Amino acid sequence: MALIYSFLTITLRVNQNVTGLALTTFGIGVGNFFGGSLLSFFGETGSISLLKTGNCYKAKLPFADNLGLFGKTFLSLGFLAYLAIIIALVTSYVLNRTRTGLNLRAVGENPATADAAGINITKYKYLSTLIGGAVAGLGGLYFVMDYTGGAWTNNGFGDRGWLAIAIVIFAVWKPGMAILSSFLFGGLYILCVYIPGLSSSAKELINMLPYVVTILVLVVVSMRKKRENQPPAHLGLSYFREDR
């Protein structure tokens, strides 16, 4: 999917926002189609369960339960959760401390200047988009194998993909901040589970909190107008070399 998006937006220079929305809808349909085919094949009606495989992804450190609340909170997660933190830390280091990362940031800020400096704009855009797509795929794998215990259900992801976009905005495009934002948004998202006696409407209102917080952050960031808190200047825009 990331390769299709890259080809359409980088090579053909189609509008990135429209392409993203179209592929999101397309991806949901493809997932439900193949999921429905597997349901028919296995004779199930609501979900496909891969509990044994899911349990492998949910395996936790054997000594986590012996460390009390700290162990249960931070050391009892599946390995994909820790892998996500490692990926964010490595990404932060690469973007801020390596030549490749600085070149990539230059492409995002001002591709014309980067192109004039000899940076291959197309290569960096393809590489970053494909890596981002792979990381997003790992997020989907985590949801199916760890969060839901290896069970596939049509439309089971709900709005969690949009929650990831909200986290990126809240973290002002900084991978290190995204780690803390993920914990905050995750806590807000499941807050209704730990508040007894809530009506269904109240639960939905609480589930809106991450998005409300994101809007507030956008307002504050736009008012302060600090350069370090702004998104990449060329975010969402196609690069036309002939206009350089």
Regions inferred by a protein language model and the residue ranges of each:
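Alpha-helical transmembrane segments within multi-pass membrane transporters and channels
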Residues: M1-V30, Y189
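Membrane-interface helix caps of multi-pass small-molecule transporters
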Residues: L3, F7-T11, F33-S37, Y93-R97, ...
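Cytoplasmic-side transmembrane-helix entry/capping segments in multi-pass membrane proteins
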Residues: V14-L23, G46, N103, N155-F157
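Hydrophobic core segments of alpha-helical transmembrane domains in multi-pass membrane transport
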Residues: I28-N32, A81-S92, G132-G140, A164-F170, ...
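Transmembrane helix-bundle core of multi-pass membrane transporters
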Residues: V30-N96, A202-I206, P232-R244
